[in-house]
Amino acid sequence: MKYKRIVFKVGTSSLTNEDGSLSRSKVKDITQQLAMLHEAGHELILVSSGAIAAGFGALGFKKRPTKIADKQASAAVGQGLLLEEYTTNLLLRQIVSAQILLTQDDFVDKRRYKNAHQALSVLLNRGAIPIINENDSVVIDELKVGDNDTLSAQVAAMVQADLLVFLTDVDGLYTGNPNSDPRAKRLERIETINCEIIDMAGGAGSSNGTGGMLTKIKAATIATESGVPVYICSSLKSDSMIEAAEETEDGSYFVAQEKGLRTQKQWLAFYAQSQGSIWVDKGAAEALSQHGKSLLLSGIVEAEGVFSYGDIVTVFDKESGKSLGKGRVQFGASALEDMLRSQKAKGVLIYRDDWISITPEIQLLFTEF
């Protein structure tokens, strides 16, 4: 079995009727495929949108609401209804499911990150299928484009999944918009996510969901940089999940980096919030970015911000102004300032094990398109 642990992300457009309401037949089809894969020995996590779709009708809305408060209220009602659909269908096959609601804070805060990881590990080891969604009823930012796309990549990286599958209404990444460009061709295998790939991702998408192709590509960066390959395929075929697990489904496959980031490096790269800035000379910049060395005090030109021992800072090349990466400091700002002022600074500010270089691929995650 090539892909034992698989994270599936199902978007709103793959769960709804034409009027935007939840399609029970589509939910049933998804759970049947999950059951078949589970019975075949796969460990599965489902990141599912659809809470708003499941709830807005129960609150008397004629169509999917657009106001934040209405969305939150609909999500609060719909989350339970959506989980009930999944749970009922899975129990028919004697499979236990579990609801986990996450927010970005569960990844930023290291203690909460550890707790979430431990809970997911126990559930998978016990044969349950975790069903994950963002906590849409309380988190405003997470209702924006890309919410569960990013979440699924973060979860896949956290549990060191063997594969992340995006099920959507578009069967992969195209060179153009397949809905309007007859010359558009699907890319079957993507070795590296770069600016050209990002440009291609501005095309096809659906009006019902909040996740477009661009957010899936940026989410794929998180996964592939963490060592998890990604597959984007259509949810319209009845056996798409099974075929994706067997690599027989048509779609776009994103190759994982051979040396994926371990958990500590993932946290530094994608979640750790910087408390200050450090500018270094050319020698220190080369030592960090090209030779994998620690950052010595002697290579620091200046520092900015209020930070303490153990905080995360961003390091810049003074000459080019380029961001080099992030790391955990061994001295607070005031102590560092005193040492730099003495002009006899010796020692290490950031050890290489507490450092992550910002690759061009990771840098794309922090670029607005």
From Swiss-Prot:
Pathway: Amino-acid biosynthesis; L-proline biosynthesis; L-glutamate 5-semialdehyde from L-glutamate: step 1/2. It is found in: Cytoplasm. InterPro entries: AceGlu_kinase-like_sf, Asp/Glu/Uridylate_kinase, G5K_ProB, Glu/AcGlu_kinase, Glu_5kinase, Glu_5kinase/COase_Synthase, Glutamate_5-kinase_CS, PUA. The keyword ATP-binding applies. Belongs to the glutamate 5-kinase family. HAMAP family: ProB. This is Glutamate 5-kinase. It comes from Streptococcus pneumoniae (strain ATCC 700669 / Spain 23F-1). The gene is proB.
